Amino acid sequence: MASQPDFTGRHAFVPSYSKRKSGVPYGDLVYKGRTYQQIIQQIHPTFDFRKHPFCHLDPDIYGVLKNTHAGWKPAFGQYEIPAKHLDGQGVDVGDVFLFYGMFRQTENLPDGTLHFKKGAPIQHIIYGYMVVSEILKDQDRIKELYPWHPHAASTEHPDNRLYLATDYGVFENRDSLLLSKPGQPNRRLWNLPAFCASSDVSISWQGKNTPVLVGGHAELNSACRGQEFVITAKTPELEKELRKWAESLIGHALA
């Protein structure tokens, strides 16, 4: 019988496939003793690895490469509209990225294979973070220092950059990381901390959608398109609340 990795209480974030003909193969990523290719073959048997052999490993905060490159550091890359949006929102050194994705509960079959649990919803869950320590925009340095990162192959874009961090991590699964409101089918309907419903808190990229206080949470029907939503507090009191929330997720005080 095949060995059964224990995913209890853990996230296995599977990066999307790369549109380029080069990059990190899914078979070069390892989690709990299995390659990502093996995991995907079980939960998504129709995925075509011949057509999409490479993944877009970004943000690279897991450290799941079989052969980690010398000098590996966590990095998150952006260019074009997302990069300009982050610049326009004033994102800089010291700011915190909270990474979220779509997750669905899995379970092991008796033969040891992994599959999605029947009826389990797809939910938005926060799975990791990084505190920006440097923003690298020199394209030659990106190629030289981070050759494994997908944005090392995007240096033709003048606004290409890497956000680097010394403080970063991947979370164990827990209720406080769930963004999607439980018990309903819309994964974009989020439960945020109550302070987010204040008119002095802004969440970028949401158009006319704003958080509304419902049952002790700020309920937001989050934008269906967009990658980076920047939360900004306009008063010292709300800035303190925002910081406290981030620290409660991360598990330690921010510098």
Where are these regions (language model features)?
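Conserved hydrophobic positions within beta-strands
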Residues: 130-132
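Contiguous surface segments at macromolecular interaction interfaces
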Residues: 1-38, 122-126, 135-255
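Short N-terminal edge-element motif at the start of the domain
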Residues: 41-123
